[in-house]
């Protein structure tokens, strides 16, 4: 967990002015943590690879996904679904099988898969009720964009109380769009205002707070802000409105930017050795059953990574996977 938290902090501080050398160090720490059973590190590593930040081979992607599945972590099914949908990670493109994996991931509780399946089932001639259930499950787990989609759907079906609750979940997850709907909803729109009417009593103070919170969420959307304390700031009626000092915990922590403990070199060495990994890269050593034999002929290290051995290095085009 020490490696994961430090890598996540480094990743947070490498979002804007991206340094590939830092990305390589982050991937190294995530790899070692993931191979030692830290599923969040595995998820962050694979998500980073999907976004082009970390370099993972097809073999690594499939192996890490299978490790998640074996550990009963639904994200493993979700990653396999993505690879099947796009014909990636050495898998043949198979949209039908991809849908099965998305549904399996959703049924096992993965919020991204629940949002995906919810979108597929949303049309009125398919399964809108199941879609709303899927989206609600995803929203309750903090899936940001799905909350506003659910809220709009419920609002348009005149389920105003449920819509308001969905938007509140969206604000908690960091969705500025949801905050905007609640801001307008508490501003007293007329019933004929089909866009913003939520059957709420006009409450200027609640509207002001949602506006202020929404501005922060929009400004920092790229950093994935969250407001888990939203019900302590703007609880939904009939709960009374408490005092609020205008502060958000996420923003305070973001601005403070306090680094977690730096992983000790001895700890990294110990964890790497336990799983037969190269501590310099986090990749399996030749003695490991997970070592990719063709990696020696194909690629020893990637741009930004420390070289695992001294000597002259020849640049090479990365082969198609």
Task: Kindly give the residue locations of the regions a language model identified.
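Short helix-capping/linker turns of helical repeat alpha-solenoids
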Residues: 36-40, 45, 52, 71-77, ...
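Structural signature of tandem alpha-helical TPR/SEL1-like repeats
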Residues: 18-28, 53-64, 90-101, 124-134, ...
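Residue at a conserved register position within TPR or TPR-like alpha-solenoid repeats
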Residues: 10, 17, 49-52, 84, ...
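TPR/TPR-like (Sel1-like) alpha-helical repeat modules
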Residues: 164-176, 183-220
